[in-house]
């Protein structure tokens, strides 16, 4: 089904300010937290039983946010994962270089059993990035990628639409 965009439409139906969160599930918050903090270098807080918020490190109350957009993952503990995820439904992290992706692959591969990581794919080039993908015991997929400056998302967005039906 193709949705036609009305020419001249200037006002969205829903007026939002920013994307603030995404949600995923785990069967074990403690295991997930350890992986998020020790493998992915994220900051975690559990405001109530069965709920954890995860974000990049570096933000203190009253300070400018570390990066924009700045959002969190909302992680819910559930007895089982009802809908296992596929690789295309992944959470991505930016690496500073291709060498950093290679280093991540080596370290994660060597320690995957300690963190409940069930699979780590060898680094490869895809869609202009160099990346590894890994999955945890909850079937959540994680990507660590490096993009050249002309292929970072801000540069791609500045180019605008490159494909039209």
Range-by-range predicted roles:
Residues 48, 87, 128:
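Exposed loop/turn and edge beta-strand positions of beta-sandwich/beta-sheet ligand-binding modules
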Residues 77, 125-127, 133, 144-151:
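Short beta->alpha transition motifs characteristic of CBS
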Residues 51, 78-80, 120-125:
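Short, solvent-exposed loop/turn elements at beta->coil junctions and helix N-caps
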Residues 76-95, 99-100:
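Helix-adjacent hinge/juxtasegments
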Residues 27-30, 91-138:
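Vicinal oxygen chelate
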Residues 14-16, 23-72:
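Core segments of cupin and vicinal oxygen chelate
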Residues 1-30, 91, 150-165:
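N-terminal beta-strand motif that seeds the catalytic metal site of vicinal oxygen chelate
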